[in-house]
């Protein structure tokens, strides 16, 4: 089932728009500190860093610039195209059920920001999510990533899905000896919470919120 092409759940074969679906298994095969880096392994999708000091960037689809790529969470445009990189950094990977990607114009449904395409991140259903998930990763550059997810009941009719992502890289390196940091130093924390409320006639209402903070430093080594 896919949602992105029609704004409602339909079979992938019945969607009027070609939708590519990537599951958590894809993310596990290509481990990275955030979804932003993971998407570089998708054909036609190119995350690009635009600043060597703060490492901010955007996502190009089929060669079109980042402002023409829409990023949504559960079909909702949480951030604008210009700030999409921060939206992708702020989603704990343990909460992702799948990623749906539309390449090419999707502006008929989602407006002018989706001329290049769109990336729709579908989070897990709180009712079906595991009680606890966790992932810890480190690299030989001393990058440290902790990703946690859990669910718990809130009262009699609500279930909360909570995810926390922590990233730390404070090891300045200059491999090419140009007196400029090769990778921006970062200290990043993101929290995502999704509440699911049971309603009559098997209907469900959801409420989601996120918190993101990051400190970045780059530039001259001295």
Regions found by a protein language model. Name each.
Residues 120, 128-129, 151-222:
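Periplasmic-side early beta-strands and strand-to-turn transitions of outer-membrane beta-barrels
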Residues 53, 111, 139-142, 183-187:
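Short sequence motifs at beta-strands and strand-loop junctions characteristic
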Residues 60, 76-103:
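Short acidic/polar hinge/loop motifs at secondary-structure boundaries
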Residues 2-28, 58, 66:
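N-terminal periplasmic "start-of-domain" segments of outer-membrane beta-barrel proteins
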Residues 19, 27, 39, 99-101, ...:
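Non-catalytic regulatory/gating segments with a bias toward low-complexity or hydrophobic composition
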Residues 6, 104, 122, 135-141, ...:
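Outer-membrane beta-barrel pore domains and translocons
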Residues 90-131:
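A beta-strand signature from Gram-negative outer-membrane beta-barrel systems
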Residues 36-77, 97:
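Extracytoplasmic beta-strand/coil segments of soluble accessory domains associated
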């Amino acid at each position: 089932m896919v949602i992105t092409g029609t704004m409602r759940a339909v079979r992938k074969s019945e969607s009027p728009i070609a939708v590519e679906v990537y599951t958590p298994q894809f993310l596990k095969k290509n481990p990275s500190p955030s979804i932003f880096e993971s998407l570089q392994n998708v054909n036609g999708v190119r995350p690009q860093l635009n600043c060597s000091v703060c490492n901010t960037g955007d996502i190009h689809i089929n060669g079109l610039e980042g402002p023409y790529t829409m990023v949504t969470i559960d079909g909702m445009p949480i951030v604008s195209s210009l700030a999409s990189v921060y939206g992708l950094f702020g989603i704990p990977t343990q909460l992702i059920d799948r990623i749906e990607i539309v390449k090419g114009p999707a502006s008929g449904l989602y407006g002018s920001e989706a001329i290049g395409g769109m990336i729709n991140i579908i989070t897990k259903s709180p009712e079906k999510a595991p009680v606890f998930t966790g992932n810890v990763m480190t690299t030989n550059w001393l990058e440290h990533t902790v990703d946690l997810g859990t669910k718990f009941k809130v009262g009699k009719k609500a279930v909360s899905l909570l995810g926390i992502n922590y990233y730390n890289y404070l090891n300045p390196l200059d491999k090419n000896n140009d007196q400029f940091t090769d990778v921006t130093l970062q200290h990043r924390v993101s929290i995502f919470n999704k509440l699911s409320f049971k309603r009559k006639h098997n209907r469900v209402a959801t409420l989601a919120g996120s918190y993101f903070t990051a400190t970045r430093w780059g530039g001259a080594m001295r």
